[in-house]
Design a protein with these regions (language model features):
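Structural detector for short beta-strands of small beta-barrel domains
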Residues: 1-28, 84-123
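Acidic (E/D-rich), amphipathic helical modules within compact regulatory domains
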Residues: 30-91
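Short nucleic-acid-contacting surface segments enriched for D/E, G, S/T with interspersed K/R
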Residues: 49-66, 143-161
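OB-fold/S1-family single-stranded nucleic acid-binding modules
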Residues: 66-102, 156, 160-173
């Protein structure tokens, strides 16, 4: 999975645990789950390693996780603006698989008219978002009528609801 600003992404976290997933005949594990705890945080991010990017031998290590959010809903934040990660209401034991992410747009890498049919005109966007504990990527289609001026720009505050998070890389420190 390619993201245009991968080198900018990073959340310092501890790789707490792994759940390897089912073994396939080719010897790889199907959809392994990893659990990352951002430094100083109490929330545990449950992430499915869809692309087998994380070395399971890194369990227990602190490192830089490069994460990209996709799917879910995106909207402009209302005052007061906030940065952070909120677990879904059904999260148990502090583990969240589809959190709400609150952040400020750092950089817009891609902004183009979308070919996806939604209920209103939309824009495809790839951007970096400061969520307080670091920068994550966002890749999605935005309904342009939901945003002032019909788009997002650096400095915009966003709320990502029930988003899926993919991991591009985990680099131990």
């Amino acid at each position: 999975m390619h993201f245009p600003r991968t080198e900018q992404l990073g959340i310092i976290c501890r790789f707490e645990q792994q759940v390897p997933g089912q073994l396939h005949p080719d010897g790889r594990r199907y959809l392994p789950q990893i659990f990352l705890r951002p430094t100083g945080g109490s929330i545990l991010l449950g992430i499915v390693d869809r692309h087998h990017r994380v070395a399971l031998s890194d369990e227990g290590k602190v490192g830089r996780a490069r994460l990209v959010a996709s799917l879910g809903s995106v909207r402009s934040q209302r005052l007061p603006y906030r940065l952070g990660i909120l677990p879904e209401s059904a999260a148990q034991s502090g583990i969240t698989f589809m959190p709400t992410l609150l952040g400020q747009v750092h950089e817009v890498a891609t902004l183009e008219a979308s070919s996806v049919l939604l209920s209103a005109p939309s824009t495809y966007v790839e951007l970096t978002l400061n969520i307080g504990v670091g920068l994550i990527g966002l890749r999605t289609n935005l309904v342009t009528t939901d945003f002032p001026g019909g788009s997002v720009a650096p400095g915009s505050f966003l709320e990502l609801l029930r988003t899926r998070i993919d991991i591009l890389e985990f680099v131990p420190l």
